[in-house]
């Protein structure tokens, strides 16, 4: 694959988090970016000019991972507070809280059909949840140290996980057994993911290396030694032909997987880079790190007519003869010092629209409509429908901020000045949240009254039946 006709360019950058950014993901429609941070908040950024950002408040410790549901109407997040949350992305702050892990949760990932969620934790376990039923399903135990990441395969039949025990494991979701194991004596993988076609996995190593494994042949295909510090995250381009990586050396690198070489080194962050993610259409990718900035990069990869890497092995692509290790290069670690293009970026100089870098932020305070645990295996206190109905009908939840804004006309365009607002925005949001809580309280009281009435009716029936029984006994005696 040749490099694209144009170099990657920095298109936008956002500031709003108060600490390092740990995870980022594009919405399926590519109109929003969600980010997680050490500041315990999630933020939702719109790629529309002058649109407001939303800060979701609910976790009590560092948010370690997040991901949009495939329908785009929900957002899952994991935290060091040992919980997983499932958010409805509106201004009401509805969320389900999943409690099952006994240690910080490091990773969340939806299956491609959105039916399941997999979580990985420092308690050495992997847990799978049903989104339809809002309940815990099962755990996977084989790792002997903290599990840092777990991902579904594109077809949902497999799960890949990596741990500080220096192993990468492949799990069958049907048998719930470990069916494959990759080990490395040098370091452990911080992050792992499937290629878009599901035949390979890529790992981001603490030993500074990026590795590509063929899970059909159980062999290492490519080994890139291009970073000078640990690799924290990676993301496949939707075509599967390239890979973007984030490292503690402060750089973002783009690898050509067909030719097996490094094509770009991007230097835009000050400090370690912790997360990177391609958009679903492959036109953008975002990065975040210790500098608390979200950088949005535009690529021209979609303009290039890629060759499918697997077509190099067409003669071997059948069950009797899978692709051979020697068919794919490089076969040994390469420093890739030659033909490397380094692009240094200063966000404040490269992005002219500085006003959009720090958009107005609306705080969304969470209230828990559902709590799900592995012990109850069901939602309590019985309001799973609050979140589940959004899962069943994505049309109930807007997929992008532009449709959210339709409910609030004042949210469109520039934020109104203080003399144009009779009530400050923060106060209005707080009042709206209080009203929502009062509505919930009213509904709860109504439900309690109904249950009391039902109990009284049942008690009355019991007394009548008891009286009849006594009458029958007296007649017989």
Swiss-Prot record:
SMART domains: WD40 (SM00320). The keyword Cell membrane does not apply. Its main location: cytoplasm. It is found in: Cytoplasm, Cytoskeleton, Microtubule organizing center, Centrosome, Centriole; Cytoplasm, Cytoskeleton, Cilium basal body; Cytoplasm, Cytoskeleton, Spindle pole. Gene3D superfamilies: YVTN repeat-like/Quinoprotein amine dehydrogenase. Pfam families: WD40. Phosphorylated in mitotic cells that may be mediated by CDK1. GO terms for cellular component: centriole; centrosome; ciliary basal body; cytoplasm; spindle pole. Residues 449-469 form a coiled coil. The keyword Coiled coil applies. WD repeats lie at residues 16-55, 58-97, 100-139, 142-181, 183-223, 226-265, 268-307. Interacts with POC1A. Interacts with FAM161A. Interacts with CEP44; the interaction is direct and recruits POC1B to centriolar microtubules. Forms a microtubule-associated complex with POC5, CETN2 and FAM161A. Interacts with CCDC15. Plays an important role in centriole assembly and/or stability and ciliogenesis. Involved in early steps of centriole duplication, as well as in the later steps of centriole length control. Acts in concert with POC1A to ensure centriole integrity and proper mitotic spindle formation. Required for primary cilia formation, ciliary length and also cell proliferation. Required for retinal integrity. Acts as a positive regulator of centriole elongation. Belongs to the WD repeat POC1 family. This is POC1 centriolar protein homolog B. It comes from Rattus norvegicus (Rat).
């Amino acid at each position: 694959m040749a490099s694209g006709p144009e170099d990657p360019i920095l298109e936008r950058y956002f500031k709003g988090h108060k600490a390092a950014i740990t995870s980022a993901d594009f919405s399926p429609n590519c109109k929003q970016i969600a980010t997680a941070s050490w500041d315990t908040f999630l933020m939702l950024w719109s790629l529309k000019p002058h649109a407001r950002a939303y800060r979701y408040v609910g976790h009590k410790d560092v948010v370690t991972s997040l991901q949009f549901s495939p329908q785009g109407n929900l957002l899952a997040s994991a935290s060091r507070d040992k919980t997983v949350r499932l958010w409805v992305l509106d201004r009401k702050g509805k969320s389900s809280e999943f409690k099952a892990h006994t240690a910080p949760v490091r990773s969340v990932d939806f299956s491609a059909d959105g039916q399941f969620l997999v979580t990985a934790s420092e308690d050495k376990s992997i847990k799978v949840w049903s989104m339809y039923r809002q309940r815990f399903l099962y755990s996977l135990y084989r790792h002997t140290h903290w599990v840092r990441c777990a991902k579904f395969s594109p077809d949902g039949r497999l799960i890949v996980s990596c741990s500080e025990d220096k192993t990468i494991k492949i799990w069958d979701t049907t048998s719930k057994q470990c069916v494959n194991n990759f080990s490395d004596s040098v370091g452990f993988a911080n992050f792992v993911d499937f290629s878009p076609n599901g035949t390979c996995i890529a790992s981001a190593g603490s030993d500074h290396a990026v590795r590509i494994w063929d899970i059909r042949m159980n062999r290492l295909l490519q080994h890139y030694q291009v970073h000078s510090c640990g690799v924290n995250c990676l993301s496949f381009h939707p075509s599967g032909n390239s890979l973007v990586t984030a490292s503690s050396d402060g750089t973002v690198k783009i690898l050509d997987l067909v030719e097996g070489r490094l094509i770009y080194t991007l230097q835009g962050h000050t400090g370690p880079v912790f997360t990177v993610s391609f958009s679903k259409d492959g036109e953008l990718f975002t990065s975040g790190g210790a500098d608390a900035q979200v950088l949005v990069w535009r690529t021209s990869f979609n303009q290039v007519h890629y060759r499918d890497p697997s077509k190099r092995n067409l003669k071997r692509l059948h069950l009797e003869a899978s692709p051979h290790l020697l068919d794919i290069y490089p076969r040994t670690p390469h420093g890739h010092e030659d033909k490397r293009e380094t692009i240094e970026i200063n966000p404040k100089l490269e992005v002219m629209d500085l006003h959009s870098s720090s958009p107005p932020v609306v705080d969304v305070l969470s209230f828990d409509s559902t709590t799900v645990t592995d012990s109850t295996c069901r939602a309590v206190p019985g309001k799973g429908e609050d979140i589940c109905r959004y899962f069943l009908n994505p049309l109930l939840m807007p997929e992008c901020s532009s449709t959210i804004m339709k409910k609030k006309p004042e949210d469109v365009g520039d934020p109104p000045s203080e003399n144009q607002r009779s009530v400050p925005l923060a106060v209005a949001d707080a009042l709206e949240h209080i009203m929502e809580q009062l509505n919930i309280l009213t509904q709860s009281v109504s439900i309690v009254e109904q249950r009391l009435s039902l109990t009284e009716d049942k008690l009355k029936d019991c007394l009548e039946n008891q009286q009849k029984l006594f009458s029958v006994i007296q007649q017989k005696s």
